[in-house]
Amino acid sequence: MTDLERVLKNSLHNFKNTKETCKKFCNNTIVLTATTFERVFKNYSESNGNMIDKIYRVIVTIDGQTRFEHYGKDANEMNNQYLLALDMCQN
C-alpha cells in the first residue's frame, strides 16, 4: 500500500482534518474521485461474525485506476464517505 493509499483509507475512516491531510497529494497529476456509491448485495461478515447481505459500497479511484473499495451497512455513513471522497482533492 502506498503512502497515498494509506492516507486515503485512514481519511475515509476518520473525518477529522481529512482535507488538510490529503492536500499535499492533491496536485495536477493526481485526480481523486469517488466514482460510485451504490447499494450492493454481497455476503459481508461483520467484526462480530454476523453476516449481512445488503450493504453500500464506495469505490475510490485515483487517475482513473481503482485503489480501494469501502463497504458499510449504514447508508448515511457511506453517503458521507462518498461526499468526503469527492471533496478531498478539490481545490
Regions found by a protein language model. Give the residues of each.
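Negatively charged, low-complexity tracts enriched in Asp/Glu with abundant Ser/Thr
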Residues: 1-33, 37
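Acidic, low-complexity, intrinsically disordered interaction modules
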Residues: 22-80
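Mixed-charge, Lys/Arg-enriched low-complexity segments
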Residues: 4-9, 65-91
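Generic low-complexity, intrinsically disordered sequence content enriched
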Residues: 8, 12, 16, 36, ...
